[in-house]
Amino acid sequence: MKLNDLSPAPGSRREKHRPGRGIGSGLGKTGGRGHKGQTSRSGGSIAPGFEGGQQPLHRRLPKFGFVSLKAMDRAEVRLSELAKVEGDLITVQSLKDANVIGQHVQRVKIMLSGEVTRAVTLKGIAVTKGARAAIEAAGGKFEE
């Protein structure tokens, strides 16, 4: 037996529907669309969320929340991610070059999560208290 000899068991697979191919198929003439009306026409689909003229759910419910523009240009970086950056001086640009943060980011804050394994110098980057203590314990320093 070879792969090209394999076939599904008889009766296990249904034949695909071919609408409009005779009354014996059960889908002749109108092709399962019924008589007249919007959905019987070609291209006659109804938009998602349309409720027949009743005010749709997504318009009945109130709006809420907003997107902070500050979140667009700020990023948080874990201590463990600093290992991805080559060199001892870490700046916003060096984090972008190492693909740790996105290209649109302008301000970065280092969070205490993971460990820092080498002494690094951070320039122009904000740091939490715990992260500052961990970096200084590893022999790192900060420049403004």
From Swiss-Prot:
Q: Which GO terms describe its molecular function?
A: rRNA binding; structural constituent of ribosome
SUPFAM superfamilies from the UniProt entry: Ribosomal proteins L15p and L18e
Q: Name one GO cellular component term.
A: cytosolic large ribosomal subunit
User: Which keywords fit this entry according to its UniProt record?
Assistant: Ribonucleoprotein, Ribosomal protein, RNA-binding, rRNA-binding
* One GO BP: translation
Statement: the UniProt record of this protein carries the keyword GTP-binding: no
UniProt lists compositionally biased (Gly residues) regions at 21-31
Q: Which domain of life is it from?
A: Bacteria
Residues of the region (Disordered) are 1-57
A Pfam short name: Ribosomal_L27A
Q: Which residues form a coiled coil?
A: none
| Family label | Belongs to the universal ribosomal protein uL15 family.
Q: How does it assemble?
A: Part of the 50S ribosomal subunit.
Q: Which purpose does this protein serve, as stated in its record? A: Binds to the 23S rRNA.
The protein's name is Large ribosomal subunit protein uL15
Gene that this sequence comes from: rplO
